[in-house]
Structures are given as C-alpha cells and as structure tokens.
Amino acid sequence: YGLHSQLGMGAPKDLMGYFGGKTGFKEKQRAAPKKTQFLGLAASGSTSGQPAQQKSRFFDKRWSFSDLPPEFVEEKDGVKLMAVGKIHNFGEGCACPMGVLTREFLENLDLGKDDLVIVDTEAGTEHFGRGVDKDFDLILVVVDPSYESLRLSKKFDEFGEQCGCKVYFVLNKVEPDIREEMLASVNCTNVVAEIPERREIFKTSLKGKELNLELDEIKKLAEFLRKS
C-alpha cells in the first residue's frame, strides 16, 4: 500500500486481473505445460547468440516496456509502476500464484539497452524459494536495526551465492550509537548506502505522502545503480 504513495503515483491495478484474477490464473496454470525452460530477461531487446526464447506458458507473446497493458501501469517522470497482486479477502488462499506470475512476467520481459527493472519483493526470504531472483543482476537488501533483520542479512548472502546474484546492503534508520553494530552484522564491504534515522521520513511515510526529500545517501545509491 505504501510504494505508490511514496512515489506520488496512483495505485496500479493488480496484473493478476489481466488473467481474470487468481481464479483465472489458476485455470491457466492447470492447463499450462508442467515444465518450461526459460532464458529469463533478454537484455538489449535481443537474444542474438542465445537459443531461441521459448513461448511463455501464460503470455501470448513476449513483452517489452511498450507492450505493458496501460490499464495496469501507473507512470510518472519516466518511471512505470506495476503491481502483481495482493491478498484482498479473508480466506482467499495463499499468495503462491502471485509468486508464479512475478517469475513468469519477468521471464517474458525483453529489455532495451536503457531499460531498468527494479523488483520490490516482500520482506523475508520467500521470493528466493519461488525463484523470482534467479535472473537479477544484483540484489539490494534493506537492513533495519532489528535482531531479525540483521540475522536475515546473512541468509541473503547465502542465497545470493546460490542463485549467482551479487548481494549489496542498504542500512536503514542508522543512528550513531548503533552504526558499528549494524556494519558488523553484514558483509560491510558490500554496504552501498546508510540511510540515517530521520523523523521527517517516518512522518511522511506514516501519512502516506510522497517522499520528496533530498538525501545524499539516496543520491549515492542511485549513482551506484547507474554504474552497475
């Protein structure tokens, strides 16, 4: 519920609705081939030198950014925002179909040379179990100052090695008296930004308003991503 408001956008419709909701998607799942090999994201819009991309189990054709259905996209300042789906009703079942659709959508997406995809996953490690991360260039882990978050950060390093992805860390809500402890709990050589504890960030997020604050660490992070 927070990402679109933090970006100053409207809430996008769930992409799951493109397939008739969870019910329609599950029907397609049952009718689809049980196993299909994909190459993942085709960078630069080309698969030259690679085996031909196989047809998706769920999409009629491969998509580029220009093929994204506009009714499921919010856009501002050149940034497109999409949402796969959420649990909206009590007792509707697990979120597994959302994980499947996320992976299939990413595998079906062709990228131009200037295109960049950022996937905001749920907190925790479940997306690794679903294989969502397998074609990512890098993984950014936001680490909060909590025991659970610091312990999980070590697990992300392990998963990154298993899926062949580089893992970097963003320390969040950093205060001077806990900074060293947070750095000691992660692979400090891969810390690319330290976001300070700022009351105005908390209050803006609490009210669901757009985050338009100027932070040097965010600029540093953006520059790191640009060069990566």
Please describe what each predicted stretch is.
Residues 205-215:
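C-terminal boundary of histidine-terminating zinc-finger modules
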Residues 22-25, 34, 89-90, 125, ...:
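Short, small-residue-enriched loops and turns at beta-alpha junctions
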Residues 96-194, 200-203:
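Conserved catalytic-core segment of NTP-binding enzymes
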